[in-house]
Curated annotation (Swiss-Prot):
Name under which the protein is recorded: Ribonuclease Z
Its job: Zinc phosphodiesterase, which displays some tRNA 3'-processing endonuclease activity. Probably involved in tRNA maturation, by removing a 3'-trailer from precursor tRNA.
UniProt organism field: Pseudomonas putida (strain ATCC 700007 / DSM 6899 / JCM 31910 / BCRC 17059 / LMG 24140 / F1)
Keyword vocabulary terms for this entry: Endonuclease, Hydrolase, Metal-binding, Nuclease, tRNA processing, Zinc
Cofactor: Zn(2+)
Family: Belongs to the RNase Z family.
Length: 319
């Protein structure tokens, strides 16, 4: 899987960072999924190779505006771009009427079916290649993380089973390799039953706002990538006297180290952290604080940067 960050700022945008939105891209590169949709997300998409027609589903972690205010505009643009296939949006139930009323009040017609599903009732959402589940987090309002797990990644024919069942090599194998149903000796054979993954499935967790990283203990162990907010550093919290429902870089890093997370991606940075080395506090203070507690592969997400999770298990920036 790949990750492409469309917004990494907390609360408000900055000149360098937009508010929260993250694209999760299938290993095939054909389709993608959007986690959160802060204001301006559709404009950020124009600076990427992602097409809104290839968007499989949208997942909203919680109700705060920096995570959802871009949704009506994105949906309207999807309609104007010619999208016709249905689109499922998994989001807090309280936002359903807000989305629908916004579209109606603005006289927006969608030429595709919009399916709004309550995140509170989500057990598992599935496509042909991914399963998505949730983990409950802690914030000032209900918030969740989304766990993306591959289904049968890079499938190959189960030759041992084919030979054992006496299915001859040739055109039948070619059809089964495509996942098609074929007839052999009067029996119907489902191609998917004869495919097996050629590598272990990847698991990526993309979190909403959260002030208790330990809530991720059950799902983070063994995960390939954890994407988690690091809104503040400890120094800021000590000065302001509270986290306001957010985590510090140190808290997340300590948790990731204890859980054995191989790739930790920090995002959702307070607007106070600067990219300009001449200004303070600099974003490197977030990195330095995390590195003091975490020995794995650490990434500070950057807007419009794409990251690839390779077969070696490492998440690295793509060219």
């Amino acid at each position: 899987m790949d990750l492409l960050f469309l917004g990494t700022s907390a609360g408000v945008p900055t000149k360098a960072r937009n508010v929260s939105a993250t694209a999760v891209i299938e290993a095939s590169g054909s389709h993608w999924y959007l986690v959160d949709c802060g204001e301006g997300t559709q404009h950020r998409l124009l600076h990427t190779p992602l097409s809104i027609r290839d968007l499989r589903a949208i997942f909203i972690t919680h109700v705060h505006g920096d995570h959802c205010f871009g949704l009506p505009g994105l949906l309207a643009s999807a309609g104007m771009s010619g999208r016709t296939q249905p689109l499922e949006v998994i989001l807090p139930a309280v936002l359903h009427d807000w989305v629908r009323q916004g579209l109606v009040a603005s006289d927006t017609f969608l030429p595709f079916e919009l399916r709004l599903l309550p995140v509170e009732a989500l057990i598992a959402w599935r496509s042909e290649t991914l399963q998505v589940t949730t983990v409950q987090l802690s914030h000032r309002v209900p918030s969740v993380g989304f766990v993306f797990t591959e289904i049968n990644p890079e499938p190959r024919l189960d030759i041992q089973r084919l030979d054992a069942e006496g299915i001859p090599r040739g055109p039948l194998w070619g059809e089964l390799a495509k996942g098609l149903t074929v007839t052999f000796n009067g029996q119907l054979l489902n191609g998917n039953d004869y495919l097996r993954p050629s590598r272990p499935p990847q698991r990526v967790i993309v979190c909403g706002d959260n002030d208790k990283p330990a809530l991720l203990a059950a799902v983070a162990r063994g995960a390939d990538v954890l994407v988690h907010e690091a809104t503040f550093t400890q120094a800021v919290v000590e000065r302001t006297g509270g986290t306001f429902g957010h985590s510090t870089a140190a808290e997340v890093a300590r948790f990731a180290e204890a859980a054995g997370v191989r790739n930790l991606v920090l995002t959702h940075f307070s607007a106070r952290y600067q990219n300009d080395p001449r200004r303070s506090p600099h974003i490197d203070t977030v990195r330095d604080e995390a590195l003091a507690h975490y020995s794995g592969q650490l990434t500070l997400a950057q807007d419009l940067q794409r990251y690839h999770l390779g077969r070696n298990g490492l998440l690295e920036a793509s060219a």
